[in-house]
């Protein structure tokens, strides 16, 4: 399931695209299908491994062209390993609520975004998120590594 409306974003042939917090790569795969040059970045090594394997299978199946794939990297959104002004479009979907220093992550994403580029960020809706926190300690940090560290309100967005 895509959590970003791709038709509203300038993603097409030649777009240099970053999926920051790619997880298992669903947004990276869609950008590659649309012809973008894709970098998928995630903090979790196991997700990086799975995403690399999925990209390889997509090449083999002819779903995407090899020149649309730049790489899948393990990295930290608060310390991105890219030069300034590297990407035309960045998606960080359902990621910021996992990052202790979300402001630092947003600064980094802005730093690597080209002037005039587009950053699309999504976070979970407040009400369902609140219910999940109440129902299970395993949903959020510190009870689970990589869990949610905050619930965003409308005013924080």
Which stretches of residues belong to each language-model region?
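S-adenosyl-L-methionine-dependent methyltransferase catalytic module, highlighting the catalytic core
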Residues: 1, 26, 43, 50, ...
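Conserved alpha-helix/loop element of class I SAM-dependent methyltransferases that forms part
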Residues: 1-13
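Conserved class I S-adenosyl-L-methionine
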Residues: 14-23
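Conserved SAM-binding loop of SAM-dependent methyltransferases across substrates and taxa
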Residues: 24-35
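Conserved SAM-binding motif I beta-strand of class I
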Residues: 37-42
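Conserved SAM-binding strand-loop segment of SAM-dependent methyltransferases
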Residues: 62-80
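A short acidic, Gly/Pro-enriched loop at the edge of an enzyme's catalytic core
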Residues: 78-89
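A short beta-strand submotif of the Rossmann-like class I SAM-dependent methyltransferase core
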Residues: 92-95
């Amino acid at each position: 399931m895509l959590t970003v409306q791709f038709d509203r974003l300038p993603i097409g042939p030649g777009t240099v695209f970053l999926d920051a917090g790619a997880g298992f790569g669903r947004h990276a795969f869609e950008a590659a299908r649309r012809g973008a040059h894709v970098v998928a970045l995630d903090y979790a090594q196991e997700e990086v491994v799975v995403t690399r394997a999925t990209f390889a299978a997509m090449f083999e199946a002819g779903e995407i062209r090899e020149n649309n794939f730049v790489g899948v990297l393990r990295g930290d959104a608060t310390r991105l390993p890219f030069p300034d002004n590297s990407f035309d479009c960045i998606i960080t979907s359902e990621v910021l609520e996992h990052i202790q220093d979300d402001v630092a992550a947003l600064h980094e994403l802005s730093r690597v975004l080209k002037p005039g580029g587009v950053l699309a960020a999504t976070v979970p809706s407040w009400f369902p998120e609140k219910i999940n926190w109440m129902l299970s300690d395993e949903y959020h940090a510190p009870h689970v590594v990589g869990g949610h560290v905050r619930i965003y309100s409308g005013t924080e967005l």
